[in-house]
């Protein structure tokens, strides 16, 4: 999400009225390669390293299983770099944190779904912009080495770079690619852009990202798109029923023009008629352009969301009860 503060308290965003299922949405044949949800919790809180169960939480394998049972085959799993690597980006792991992260990843992949590992750090470590491409490459070489033998694991270079030098964003993404490949990992790599990797600003801000290279040719351009007035994902109010499609149209053309493939790694809208139309319209537009769009993941599931406006956590998350029928159309 655009504003980091939204992650500091699990249920700070308020609540929304649920819209019941059965609104006439006809299930179409599955067209996306990957479709699912973010799994949030391990990146919560401001206490570093913090205490598991007090300051942060790991996703619940049983609710992941529930979502897999609904047909989801993709989960973007958040973690915080400072908790995994408390001393330095190139230092030793906190073994308990790594084990818990791996448990979540295994819960996803044992269920036959794909796990996208997401360092949810906004291009920063200990509050400072990551400026060493060498250290970032080492970070990724080490982490990819942990998961290189699991074909269902994929790697997200970092969540939502923002207010950074554009060449640095490009170079950090390339360093991540280089590190992952140096580890012997051959899975897909999801790269993110500057300005919170927004689809609606991608063409103006992140055009240089087309210059990334990968010997495996498995780069996926991950963009995020919220549908409220400022695109921050902090309001349950969507601009209009067509805003979803409108905000990704230019990015779609950019992907086509540059022969790239993309993925909407975060999106959401409130459980109301306007947002339901906006989300449905965006997904339908993507479904009609699967030559460039590989899929999407909702923001977000996770055990500590409470009555958060976009919670997809079973059994009673606001979006689980009010938006899941829209998503099920594409499962």
From Swiss-Prot:
- Temperature dependence comment: Optimum temperature is 70 degrees Celsius.
Keyword Metal-binding, does the record have it?
no
Supply the enzyme class, top level.
Answer: hydrolase
What are the glycosylated positions?
Answer: 38, 100, 211, 288
Q: Give the Pfam families listed for this entry.
A: Cellulase (PF00150)
Q: What is its main location?
A: secreted
Q: Which GO terms describe its cellular component?
A: extracellular region
Recorded GO molecular functions are: cellulase activity
| Role according to the record | Has endoglucanase activity on substrates containing beta-1,4 glycosidic bonds, like in carboxymethylcellulose (CMC), hydroxyethylcellulose (HEC) and beta-glucan. Involved in the degradation of complex natural cellulosic substrates.
Q: What is this protein called?
A: Endo-beta-1,4-glucanase B
The organism of origin for this protein: Aspergillus niger
Signal peptide positions are 1-18
Q: What is its EC number?
A: 3.2.1.4
pH effects: Optimum pH is 6.0.
Do you know what upregulates this one?
Expression is under the control of the xylanolytic transcriptional activator xlnR.
- Example GO biological process: cellulose catabolic process
Task: Determine if Glycoprotein is one of this entry's keywords.
Answer: yes
As its record notes, the protein acts as a catalyst of: Endohydrolysis of (1->4)-beta-D-glucosidic linkages in cellulose, lichenin and cereal beta-D-glucans
- Keywords from the UniProt entry: Carbohydrate metabolism, Cellulose degradation, Glycoprotein, Glycosidase, Hydrolase, Polysaccharide degradation, Secreted, Signal
Q: Where in the cell is it found?
A: Secreted
Point out the gene that encodes the protein.
Answer: eglB
Q: Which family does it belong to?
A: Belongs to the glycosyl hydrolase 5 (cellulase A) family.
């Amino acid at each position: 999400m655009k504003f980091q503060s939204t992650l500091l308290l699990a249920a700070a965003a308020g609540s929304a009225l649920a819209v019941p299922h059965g609104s006439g949405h006809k299930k179409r044949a599955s067209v996306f390669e990957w479709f699912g949800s973010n799994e949030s919790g391990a990146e919560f809180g401001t206490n570093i390293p913090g205490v598991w169960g007090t300051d942060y939480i790991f996703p619940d394998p049983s609710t992941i299983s529930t979502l897999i049972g609904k047909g989801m085959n993709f989960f973007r799993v958040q973690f915080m770099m400072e908790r995994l690597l408390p001393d330095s980006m190139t230092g030793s792991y906190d073994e308990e944190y790594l084990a818990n992260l791996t448990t979540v990843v295994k819960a996803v992949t044992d269920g036959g779904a794909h796990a996208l590992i997401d360092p949810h750090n906004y291009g920063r470590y200990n509050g400072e912009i990551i400026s060493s491409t060498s250290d970032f490459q080492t970070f990724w070489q080490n982490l990819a080495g942990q998961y290189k033998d699991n074909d269902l694991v994929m790697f997200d270079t970092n969540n939502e770079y923002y207010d950074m030098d554009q060449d640095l964003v490009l170079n950090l993404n390339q360093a991540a690619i280089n590190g992952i490949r140096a580890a012997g990992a051959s899975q897909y790599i999801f790269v993110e852009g500057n300005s919170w990797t927004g689809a609606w600003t991608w063409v103006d801000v992140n055009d240089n990202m087309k210059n990334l290279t990968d010997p495996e040719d498995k780069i996926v351009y991950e963009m995020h798109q919220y549908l409220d007035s400022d695109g921050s994902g902090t309001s349950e109010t969507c601009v209009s029923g067509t805003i979803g499609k409108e905000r990704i149209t230019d990015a779609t053309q950019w992907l086509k023009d540059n022969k790239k493939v993309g993925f909407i790694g975060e999106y959401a809208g409130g459980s109301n008629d306007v947002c339901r139309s906006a989300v449905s319209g965006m997904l339908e537009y993507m479904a009609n352009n699967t030559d460039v769009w590989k899929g999407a993941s909702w923001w977000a599931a996770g055990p500590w969301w409470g009555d958060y406006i976009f919670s997809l956590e079973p059994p009673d998350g606001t979006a689980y009860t009010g938006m899941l029928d829209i998503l099920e159309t594409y499962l």
